[in-house]
Amino acid sequence: MSEPRFVHLRVHSDFSMINGIAKVKPLIKACVDNHMVAMGLTDFTNFCGLVRFYGEALSAGVKPIIGADVLVRSELCGDEPFELTLLAKNNIGYHNITLLLSKAYERGYQDLPYLDQAWLAEHREGIIVLSGGHNGDVGKKLLKGHAAEIESAVAFYQDFFPDHFYLSLSRTGRYEEERYVSLALTLAEEKGLPVVATNDVLFLHEDDFEAHEIRVAIHDSYTLDDPKRPKLYTNQQYFRSEQEMCDLFADVPSALENTLLIAQRCNVTIRLGEYFLPQFPTGDLSTEDFLVKKSKEGLEERLKFLFPDEKVRQARRPEYDERLQVELDVINQMGFPGYFLIVMEFIQWSKDNDIPVGPGRGSGAGSLVAYALKITDLDPLEFDLLFERFLNPERVSMPDFDVDFCMDGRDRVIDHVAETYGRGAVSQIITFGTMAAKAVIRDVGRVLGHPYGFVDRISKLIPPDPGMTLAKAFAAEPQLQAVYDSDEEVKALIDMARKLEGVTRNAGKHAGGVVISPGLITDFSPLYCDSEGKHPVTHFDKNDVEYAGLVKFDFLGLRTLTIIKWALDMINTRLAKEGKPPVDIATIPLDDPASFELLKRSETTAVFQLESRGMKDLIKRLQPDCFEDIIALVALFRPGPLESGMVQNFIDRKHGNEVVAYPDPEYQHDSLKPILEPTYGVIVYQEQVMQIAQELAGYTLGGADLLRRAMGKKKPEEMAAQREIFEKGAIQKGVDGELAMKIFDLVEKFAGYGFNKSHSAAYALVSYQTLWLKTHYPAEFMAAVMTSEMDNTDKIVGLYDECLRMGLKVAPPDINTGKHHFSVNEYGEIVYGIGAIKGVGEGPIEALISAREQGGIFKDLFDLCARVDLKKINRRTFESLILSGAFDKLGPHRAALSKNLEDALKASDQHAKDAAMGQADMFGVLTESHEDVEKAYASTPRWSEKVILEGERETLGLYLSSHPISPYLKELAHYSATRLKDLVPNSRGQMSTVSGLLVSSRFAVTKKGNRLGIATLDDRSGRLDITLFGEALDKYADKLQKDTVIIVSGQVSFDEFSGGLKMSVRELMSLDEARSRYAKSLAICLSEENMKPTFIRELKALLTPYSGGTLPIYVYYASTAGQCRVKMGVQWSVNPTDQLFTELAEKLGENAVELEFQS
């Protein structure tokens, strides 16, 4: 191979985010293909790609040069920032660039982060500076021809970076670039400055230029043809070959030679794959001994709880002691005692500070040491959970506890960790958003200037599934391939989108990842902050940050823990008033019969993980009656097991409809019974795979974990090796080789569906806790759940329906007793949370509750207005509170409150003015007009029920005092016998008929371009989504009117998207049509009170507008003398409309009018 002549020192990957589209791996491959011995990755103001670049480069035999392109400001250049390239000459330089990048983000920035030139002087050691070409400070001054300023600019680098400053030259066809090169070469000769050739690489190939321009336009929010779009780049900024660069700079050979010289000078060594933990304070003991001490103390406490009887405890102790010792030996030998102690401390702090912590998550629940240290709350021995699934001495990797915290307290825990280990030693982790399939189509389409409808049509052909790619979309949606093949514009758009798919678009914060450093985070990674310089995160993502040596801790927020806390707070407050002991959720029995009865009835709405329609169906079929069944439910309710048929095997075996075998009637072994008995012989868990390998073939559990992973990967060479090991081990244990391999094949088949039992058991415990709370404290539990959904009106509606089904009363919001959140009053009623009222913010609520706490309950509307700070509550807020029912106790009815609101506000305003003048007489202000107020109240007619309900729906999102459909329920039973809550999917060819209030409707277009109507029915027992296609839509579209009552017939099926049911409508009737079809007659009941001389004339006048119909009228008359039934003549027959019934009810009374049907 010939001697190298050039290397690229200034290259951007897609991690630059403002420009650059090349991925790190293809860049390294380009180096190898072009025989380049080194490469400098200099992404804009970040090291985000550094770890993978460093690793990939070394693996490929390419020397990695660490650097970054930065913006700098100086006194000389004023507010105009300039570009520099900083390269790390050694580890000191690497550390200094890390500090500089961190400082740029930490001080905040408006558009792009930048450095101060003074910082460069301060952190200059170990850094080589490339001048930034025509965009650098020297370049800008050269182009402007300011001799004195050129002198000053150069002097800075000669003073602070002697022998470490290079004038960078590039020839990419950019504006003023060639003039700069000429001036720079002259300056270099005059000042004795070295020059270096770069190509400012942004993409791999010349034909990637348009894709790059689109990427930049997406970032900058331009369209490609916008005349205002800055054109900063050219098609020459690709990864030029060595020969191309040599040809380009043949006239400046030193510029080429210096790339190699700089590459030789840059020698940074980064320690990857090691782990560095902060020192946990352990006093005089070593970290290992301290872990042993705390674990043994914790186990003793746990054993006293698990086995209160001393004899039983002593009998069980040896197996716990032995397991603990095995785990401690592994943890200490692998060097992880500090990790366990750190997690122990922040979890204990959380519990001490009333921040709920989950019982465990993931494989960590399989550790007895974790249980002893109270990191987890599930006894791993009781549920056959394996430590080796978490930490395997035969597969060295960091332990990884994912810890769930109450949503409200999670940030407090992270703050505590920062206080404990130092703010500079704790950071959250960056995460990167990429151009995903749907989004990249939309973005590219917008930049190319396509109409919204055109782009939307293509985007909607891409399935919304997580992890969807364009390649997967083409495989899943034939129409996408068809439109791609038939439309050149579509093809061009998709081809361009393919080039940009997966390109890093932006940076964000990882949901739960936190790193704790033994020193400063900046010893390992720069810090990236938001524009205000807050919320620091590492430049390395969750994988790279661990590879760089920092240990990741996952602090996850679980809403269910917050719900449990809120429920317990309400429960224990009530129990304290009653003189009863509090509920400790950690000590509830796991075999509560009442809880399992509720579970078997599938009444699991709001129960963690068990509330979806599909899960409810599985519960009905399984009829779980023990905690192990709940663990299995969590593991089985996934696409793989559901589609494989093993779920049905599990159900059939539980109910005796299939032989229980271990694992199969044809191929079983007695030694597997203890392993598979809890799951009726079905291999459900990964731990069972490991135990079978241990029991049948003599694997260590560590080796069995490797087998499990190999089965998951399905690599033929690995599986061939494992089959051999399994067969040999089984024969050595006296098991028939053929039988062993038959069982191996079965295990391999189910291993792909196997779930981590440790995670399933831990989450099953949370599920059970919510189930137990719903069973024994339903009001408090549902109030807590509704509080958690206060911002989601649709969810509140569903939960309210569930409360009605449970027999719980939900009282309207009450300004005198209610709280911001949902609560439970002394009558066991759930009181609607004031914070859930639309149009009422936290500020007004705080003002109202503060006034109530200071002066007691409000006597009336005038009293309230006089006592609250009206600067914090506007008129619209008061109106929302009246409409919602929150002020019902402040006046006779809502209409009166609404009418007198203006007077109450004026009186309050007058009171405030008088108080300011020293003439305060609140009671005078309020009582002077007391009689007038009473008169105003008395003279104000009540709102109709319809108006009241519309106000409730407007402010609460639901009907609380009643329901618009309530007056019709008796009548609707004649048209449809099935309530929505009782609906089940139809068999083929069958149809169901239901009725309800149409609460929403819309029209859409399918992927194939066909119209469909989508609507939602509500009959107060539940809700149902209905769809209308083709002929049905054409026939009934005009009847999909919101807030009307309709009767529909159609095919009912599961809705996989929502987890509920849906109906495809075949027939639809309005209420008037149903009456005309099914009603026999209209009954009018009269009494002596009605029979005024003018009554017949008035009744005829009322009925005349509705005459000409086919429904006959019967009059029932009752008096002291007797009763009779009279059929009115044909000329009296009417059309049975709602308006007619309303007028008759107003005239005769609601109970005097009724439809009659055939018996």
From Swiss-Prot:
Entry keyword Phosphoprotein: no
Main location: cytoplasm
Its EC number(s): 2.7.7.7
SUPFAM superfamilies (alphabetical): PHP domain-like (SSF89550)
Keyword list, A-Z: Cytoplasm, DNA replication, DNA-directed DNA polymerase, Nucleotidyltransferase, Transferase
Reaction catalysed by this enzyme: DNA(n) + a 2'-deoxyribonucleoside 5'-triphosphate = DNA(n+1) + diphosphate
CDD domains given in the database record: DnaE_OBF (cd04485), PHP_PolIIIA_DnaE1 (cd07433)
GO CC term, one of those recorded: cytoplasm
GO BP annotation list: DNA replication
GO MF, one annotated term: nucleic acid binding
Pfam families in alphabetical order: DNA_pol3_alpha, DNA_pol3_finger, DNA_pol_IIIA_C, HHH_6, PHP, tRNA_anti-codon
Broad EC category: transferase
Coiled coil: none
Subcellular location: Cytoplasm
Function in brief: DNA polymerase III is a complex, multichain enzyme responsible for most of the replicative synthesis in bacteria. This DNA polymerase also exhibits 3' to 5' exonuclease activity. The alpha chain is the DNA polymerase.
Similarity annotation: Belongs to the DNA polymerase type-C family. DnaE subfamily.
Subunit: DNA polymerase III contains a core (composed of alpha, epsilon and theta chains) that associates with a tau subunit. This core dimerizes to form the PolIII' complex. PolIII' associates with the gamma complex (composed of gamma, delta, delta', psi and chi chains) and with the beta chain to form the complete DNA polymerase III complex.
Protein name per Swiss-Prot or TrEMBL: DNA polymerase III subunit alpha
Organism listed in the record: Pasteurella multocida (strain Pm70)
Gene: dnaE
